[in-house]
Amino acid sequence: MKKVEYWVKIPFGPIHPGLEEPEKFIITLDGERIVNVDVKLGYNLRGVQWIGMRRNYVQIMYLAERMCGICSFSHNHTYVRAVEEMAGIEVPERAEYIRVIVGELERIHSHLLNLGVVGHDIGYDTVLHLTWLARERVMDVLEAVSGNRVNYSMVTIGGVRRDIGEKQKRLILDMIKYYREVLPQIEDVFLHDSTIEARLRDVAVVPKKLAIEMGAVGPTARGSGIKEDSRWSEQLGVYPDLGIKPVTPEDVTGEKARGDVYDRMAVRIGELWMSLDLLEHALDQMPEGKIKTFPKDNILVAKLKLLGDGEGIGRYEAPRGELVHYVRGQKGRDGPVRWKPREPTFPNLFTIAKALEGNELADLVVAIASIDPCLSCTDRVAIVKEGKKVVLTEKDLLKLSIEKTKEINPNVKGDPTPTGIGCSRGV
């Protein structure tokens, strides 16, 4: 008899307990086996680029920070580097060291958060409690250094806004000592626990070839054995003086990279140790001197407005992978004519979608979590050029909203009005 296969398509998201943020995946299944994953972006779009092109260079710094709450420093830092390249602005050496310190503090908190999320997603909440308890220490230090647990506003064009004094240095050194005592326990649980290994080994394997073809970045790429880290390859700032190098699974486990969820977690654990080393070296080597080139923001904006046409690209290794910001300026404008961020989740999301083919449906959540997706800074609009142009007013949007609501629920009554009064539900 001829074998007949029945494939089923099910939606995963956009609202689902297994997702940190709204996003939609259409899963094609053959029984419990995943045949295809179709990624549907757009549920978190906030029009950040559109807003940015209507702001000046300084205002965009605060906008860039709010693209992502976990790696707010990374976005601002990368944007600022793009503007500095465009304008030819030199950054004081002390400011470069402070940037390293804040960046590595952010990396520690981001990796600990993701380790806890993965533990929770496989039902191992002991790991969640261990990692998130440890994460509180670095959050306290970030608050002491910047004044905030999130959105630190430390970086500015041409330097940093705040210095790191002796009190903050002592807090960071105490934190490093604390983590050198705590991390061995977290590492032991993650790398040598049979339950975790059974759930993470050989799940959502990203072969090295696939990672290269799909443009994977960060721990997702390094977990497949690719030695790539933009802090290292770009010789970024003072990182070369601090002994930066890419971390691969072989450095942590001693085994050749397989490219599975386990290896991606191993890379993050290895990078926690690397961040502690970088912090120690940065605090030890940081020179005295000024922390920014321009004392006032209005002086900075005036200088940028006088520049001729130009463009700049900023690259930085955010916790999730390589982050890129592109800026193009125009003479006489106090803001860019084009600002384009490229987030690490964008290539990683499509990489993991391909890697999920052939896996069990039960592994979907932990596989997605293993790339540590940030969907709020990834979403964008696709502009389809059909030769038509339509401008929708607030009234038009209200009318479309009510029409859609009536399609979903015919019992809803109401009409669009200039005052924006919505619908009323019939009794």
UniProtKB/Swiss-Prot annotation:
Where mainly located?
A: membrane
Query: What is the protein's quaternary organization?
Result: The membrane-bound hydrogenase complex is composed of MbhK and MbhL, and may also contain MbhJ.
Functional description taken from the UniProt entry: Alpha subunit of a hydrogen-evolving hydrogenase that utilizes protons both as a substrate for hydrogen production and proton translocation. Acts by coupling the redox reaction via ferredoxin and iron-sulfur (Fe-S) clusters to proton translocation across the membrane thereby conserving the redox energy in a proton gradient.
The family annotation for this protein states: Belongs to the complex I 49 kDa subunit family.
InterPro entries cross-referenced by the UniProt entry = ComplexI_49kDa-like, NADH_Q_OxRdtase_suD, Ni-dep_hyd_lsu, NiFe-Hase_large
Q: Name one Pfam family in it.
A: NiFeSe_Hases
Q: Which GO terms describe its biological process?
A: proton motive force-driven ATP synthesis
What activates or inhibits this protein? Inhibited by 0.1 mM Cu(2+).
Annotated Ni(2+) binding lies at C68, C71, C374, C377
Activity profile over pH: Optimum pH is 7.0. Active between pH 6.0-8.5.
The name this protein carries in UniProt is Membrane-bound hydrogenase subunit alpha
Q: Which Gene3D superfamilies match?
A: Cytochrome-c3 Hydrogenase, chain B (1.10.645.10)
Cofactor stoichiometry and binding remark:
Binds 1 nickel ion per mole of protein.
List UniProt keywords, sorted A-Z.
Cell membrane, Membrane, Metal-binding, Nickel, Oxidoreductase
